Amino acid sequence: MISSKTSFIALIGNPVSHSLSPIMQNAALQYLGLDLIYIAIQCRDEDLELVLNSLKKINCKGLNI
């Protein structure tokens, strides 16, 4: 269950909508009992710096590209 203490990790790229990573990673995270979620973030090349800086500010725990 997602709470105010839940952290996140993400897949970032363009495109990411086809990726099965969020399904697989979230199943593994839940199985392990970790308070993390894995999300996919669509990001255009020209927005990469802005997105990365924003993710730092909201304490993203890790990224896959």
Each model region followed by its residue ranges:
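N-terminal ligand-binding/catalytic initiation module
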Residues: 1-65
